[in-house]
Each structure stands twice: as structure tokens, then as C-alpha cells.
Amino acid sequence: MTVAGRTVLIAGATSASGQAVARALVDAGARVVVVGSDQGRLDALVAEVPGVVGELADLTDGDDVLELAMRVHARVGDLDGVVHLVGGWRGGGGILGQSEEDYRVLERSFTALRYVSRAFWTDLVDSPAGRIAIVSSTTVAAPSAGSANYTAVKAASESWMQALAQGFAKSPDAAAAAVTFRVRSLAGLEGVLADAVVALWDAEADAATLNGSVTELVAPA
């Protein structure tokens, strides 16, 4: 089993990590749908990585996500994978510095994860090798006052992924897997992340082993 011939959607694809993942998946033979909220950045990504399918959507809007799902199904059919890269960081200032404004910006990534995973749930369950992956943070295991808002959102996202994993395990074929990657920072790890995503469809990457897993990504020694 490989990712070749699989159809994978990257949510929040216009970042450096999104571009790296898109390129690695295309090079490995996957069909890739890249989703972004900025038309200019999305157009640049489509031009930079030939072969990807670009889709503009606000992933924090439930109706927009449902419309996205209909367009994706019409253009490329059902998905085999979702890579959720919607994110960002705000923090500092201790507990008193954890502003409501910052939290509302950060929670958009969790909102997007919930909408996208629900919209493509049936695709992933029905696929012979459904995969959904997120990038979380090592701060979930060691929270700090200055990153309380950020870490709370990441912890909620990890909890959602464990719930998806339980749902996948109960499905008739149990062929899908929900995977969490943790990083201290994505800067400099774009290639490592891309390789890890492609490896989700390796022959030895069976769903039972992957499902519910949490793996820290680090730079090669």
C-alpha cells in the first residue's frame, strides 16, 4: 500500500508546511486538493506545485465547508485523507496576557477541524485507507502560563482526534486512522512533516497501529 492514487485534501495549505506536504504527496503519486482562505496565496501554491487542485473556502464557516465538500466530490471524488494544517500562534504575557481576542483567533483552527472532519467523515470511513492528521504542539504535555490559550486549543484538537479514532475503530472495516503529530515548532520541520504524512500510507502503516497515535516530530540527527 502506498499513497499513490489516493486523494488527499490539505486544509490550510498555503503555509510553508502546506506547500511541502502538497509537493511530497504529488511527487508520491497522490491527487491533492489544497484549500486556503486567501485567493492570492492559493493561486501561488497552485502555480508552485503543478497538479494540485485549488479550492478557496472559509473552513470556520460550516456552510462554506459543506459547499467545499460538494465541490471536492464533484471534481475529484471521495477522499482518502485529510491533513489539517489550519493554525497559528499567539501567546506570551503569562495568564493575564491570555486575551480573549487571541483565544478567538486561535480557536478557529479547532473549529475548522471539527467542520472538516465531519464533512469528510464518510469518505474516510469508506476508504480502504482513510487517514486524517493534525499538527499539535509539545506544549500539550507541558503547558505554560504564556501559552495557555494556544495549548488549550491544541489539547481540544487532540481530544477531538482521539474521538475520531474511537469512531474509526468502531466502523465495520476499521481501516481509517486519526493521527496527531506534535512539534515544538514547525519552522525547519516542513520536510519532516511532509515525509511523515506520505508515510501514513506505507505498507507497514496499518490503521490499527496508526489510529489514535501521537508522535513527536523532530529534526533528523
Give residue spans per PLM region.
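Catalytic loop of short-chain dehydrogenase/reductase
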Residues: 88, 94-114, 125-170, 182-187
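C-terminal helical subdomain
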Residues: 166, 170-221
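Conserved glycine-rich Rossmann-like NAD(P)H-binding loop of the short-chain dehydrogenase/reductase
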Residues: 28-44
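Conserved glycine-rich cofactor-binding loop
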Residues: 14-15
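Rossmann-fold cofactor-recognition segment
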Residues: 48-63
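Conserved mid-core alpha-helix of short-chain dehydrogenase/reductase
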Residues: 64-67, 108-119
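Conserved Rossmann-fold cofactor-binding substructure of NAD(P)-dependent oxidoreductases
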Residues: 60-75
